[in-house]
């Protein structure tokens, strides 16, 4: 990376930081429920429909169930439509899930919202590290992919801080709603980021793939990356 010029360094930093918001969304969704659950139960008690322990457990676990579905969908979706649209799809799911929480006045609606958020989390867990791994140089790949865990942990911490600040006012819906800020930033930010060069190459957009690589690689690194992508493409074809 020492041979990269300033513009390439800026592009790498921008791409990894922006896409890393997916990790923040992931972590926030994991952490926010810990502070919100007591307020949610209080809301339903006041409405005359207190949640049973089973229902509370289902609300906690719905994200895991949705996450399983999301991870199963993410791979085929990323291969067929691209890494970039798949990340944007996760953002749409986050928006939909939060929208349902804003409207939730029943256990079923709240459970559905958590399932939708879980699907978003599962997609992010696959698509974001995949995109980062394919956009940066091989020599720095491990370091940048590991940043996803840093962003995820930051998201959990952020959720705890938000919970601490809002719990006294009983604003459990706002606890969830605040994640819309990084979600919207990620969604619209992805419009300006390029598609993964590996996906472009594998789908016949060779010139565009080379252009994207040159945004974040030196010419020598680009040649090595193209060779790696081409070899992997032949291996993938051979496996079928």
Language-model segments: what does each one mean?
Residues 1-240:
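Transmembrane-helix signature of 12-pass secondary carriers
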């Amino acid at each position: 990376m020492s041979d990269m010029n300033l513009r390439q360094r800026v592009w790498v930093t921008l791409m990894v930081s922006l896409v890393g918001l997916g990790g923040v969304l992931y972590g926030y969704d994991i952490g926010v429920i810990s502070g919100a659950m007591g307020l949610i139960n209080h809301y339903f008690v006041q409405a005359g429909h207190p949640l049973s322990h089973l229902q509370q457990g289902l609300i906690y676990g719905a994200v895991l169930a949705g996450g399983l579905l999301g991870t199963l969908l993410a791979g085929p979706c990323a291969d067929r439509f691209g890494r970039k649209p798949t990340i944007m799809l996760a953002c749409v799911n986050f928006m939909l899930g939060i929208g349902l929480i804003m409207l939730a006045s029943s256990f079923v609606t709240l459970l559905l919202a958590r399932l939708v958020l879980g699907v978003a989390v599962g997609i992010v867990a696959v698509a974001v590290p995949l995109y980062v791994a394919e956009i940066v140089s091989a020599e720095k790949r491990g370091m940048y992919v590991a940043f996803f865990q840093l962003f995820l942990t930051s998201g959990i911490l952020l959720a705890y801080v938000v919970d601490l600040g809002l719990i006294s006012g009983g604003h459990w819906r706002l606890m969830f709603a605040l994640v819309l800020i990084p979600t919207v930033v990620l969604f619209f930010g992805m419009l300006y980021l390029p598609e993964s060069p590996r996906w472009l190459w594998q789908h016949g957009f060779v010139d565009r793939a080379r252009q994207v690589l040159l945004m974040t690689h030196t010419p020598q690194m680009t040649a090595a990356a193209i060779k790696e992508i081409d070899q992997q493409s032949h291996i993938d074809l051979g496996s079928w």
